[in-house]
Amino acid sequence: MHFCHIVGWGLVLAVLYLRTEAKPVAQAHQKSLRALLGEELAEYLVSGERGERSIDPKTRARLLRDIRADTRSRAAWTRLLNEHPNSRKIKGINKKGTSKGCFGLKLDRIGAMSGLGC
C-alpha cells in the first residue's frame, strides 16, 4: 500500500515538473497580448524581451502618473463607501459604556440586585 502511494506521488510530481518547464510564448499569443495591452504597455513587453529600457521618459512618467491617480481614486471610493469611518473609536466607547456586572447584569451599586457583591 505504501509503495502505491509513493509511485502515485512520484507520478504527480513528474507531471507537475513537466508542466512547469519554461516554454517560449507563441507569436500568436504575443500579438493578442500586445493588442490587449495597447501601444504604451506593449513597449514594456518588447523592451523586457530585449533586456533594454528604450521607453521614452515622458511616456513612462505619464504611465506612472496614471497609476498614482487610480490609487488615489480607489482610496477616495473606499472612504466614501465606508459606513463607519471611526468604527474603532465607537467600539472603544461602547465597550467601556456597556460593561457588565459580575453576573451578566449591570449593577448600580455593588450587590444591589444579588446581595452578594462581586
Swiss-Prot record:
Annotated GO MF terms: hormone activity
InterPro entries listed in its UniProt record: C_natriurtcpep (IPR002406), Natr_peptide (IPR000663), Natr_peptide_CS (IPR030480)
Covalent S-S links between cysteines: 102-118
Propeptide: 23-96
Biological process (GO), any one: cGMP biosynthetic process
Pfam families according to UniProt: ANP
Record SMART domains: NAT_PEP
PANTHER family: C-TYPE NATRIURETIC PEPTIDE
Record-given protein name: C-type natriuretic peptide 2
Provenance organism: Aquarana catesbeiana (American bullfrog)
